[in-house]
Amino acid sequence: EYSQQNNRGKFATEILSIIKDSDRENSLGKLKEYRLNKHFDYKADEYILQTVTSSFTMKDLVCTQDVREEFEYFIKERQQTEALVQMDIPVSNKILLHGPSGCGKTLSAYVLAGELSRPLIIVNLGTIISSRLGETSKNLTQIFKTAVQEKAIVLLDEFDSLGKIRDYDQDHGEMKRVVNTILQLFDFVSQDTIIIAATNQLQMIDEALIRRFDLSIKMDLPNS
């Protein structure tokens, strides 16, 4: 049985954890607030946890060699995007990061933003359980359009929230519309825009969403 109170409590705990991680990383002076040229109304702000520029590099990331090689290849590919596009070679721009909490998914987004010198917009999909569920599609569309204009990296945190709520009877129709909106937005963004989704519950995500990603990277805890 779905318990809204329990989910809110879990959600609050996860947000506090993200904020603590962010504070720790900010204390290193490697993140700076980035002011967006917003093309959305104030309600869409509720979905955004951070907009930053980063000076994190691959040297800051603790991960397995396989994961490191995947990130390094992606970075090199993105650095040569213009040449690849001229040769009609498709360029990866959508990454799904999955693994347990604390394995470095958010830090990985900071690293990619730093290596590629892109602003990073962190979007909190967990807020779709809010009372304004009906406005989710519109707000996400506004944020994505802003990301395209800013040539930003978008991190969709708590990506499994889409799957968690889709399976419950309440608001089923609206959640289906939100999932369809995400699918359409994935197709809408140009190759200049990079989308990263993070989840610790891969099994909760719709297969149609998973198939939209160019890369799916499994991340483990540093000591595993």
Enumerate the language-model features and the residues they cover.
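Interdomain "pre-motor" coupling segment immediately N-terminal to P-loop NTPase/helicase cores
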Residues: 2-57
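Flexible nucleotide-interacting loop at or near the entrance of a catalytic core
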Residues: 47, 51-56, 60, 76-81, ...
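Walker A/P-loop NTP-binding motif of AAA+ ATPase domains
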Residues: 66-70, 76-224
